[in-house]
Amino acid sequence: MPYAIVLSFDDESSLPIYQIFNKYEDKKIGSMFYDPKMKPHITLNTYEKINTESAKERLTLFSIENKSFKIQISSIGYFPVEKSVIFLNPKASNELLVIQQKVSSLFKDFEAGTSPLTWIPHCTLGMYIQKEDITQAIDIIKEEIVITEEKPFYIQTTSISFVKFERDPLKIDWWLDYQFKG
């Protein structure tokens, strides 16, 4: 069963994302975040196998040594693959890139799903979105989140989280948050 290390957000940042999840579910757009344990996040990496006790200890120390930071969302993105992913695209900031590199280093003794060189930071809003639903999916995002140069949308990170999940269909087994204290 796979695991993920993710950045979790504060309630204010998460609210419009939850509203998008709910509207997608109501309108039967895609199928992704209908597990009530799912939280808005940016995945830093995934692992097929990991020593969970060691990971928990490492994340406890990591959360003490690192601090919360803001992430500016620059655009809405879309991966036109079989699973059709629509997402919020964060502006690549030094803080975001450094935290992903630190996590990769911290867990280098486990086989990661993504290399820091190929990592594409994003906050997934939906998967399995049919081609004919893309315009409606984007319109729903625009109703909830306004992204302009004059009024950028920011996400406030609050914790690094350790998640155990199942794929296809997505199901969260557990989600542990480690609040940043640094």
Region roles according to the model:
Residues 76-81, 155-170:
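Glycine-rich beta-strand-turn "strand-cap" elements at beta-sheet edges
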Residues 87:
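Short hydrophobic beta-strand segments that form the core of ligand-binding sensory/regulatory domains
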Residues 1-71, 93-149, 167-182:
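Basic, often amphipathic N-terminal segments
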Residues 51, 73-75, 83:
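Solvent-exposed, flexible loop/coil residues
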Residues 37, 81-83:
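Structural motif corresponding to the early beta-alpha repeats
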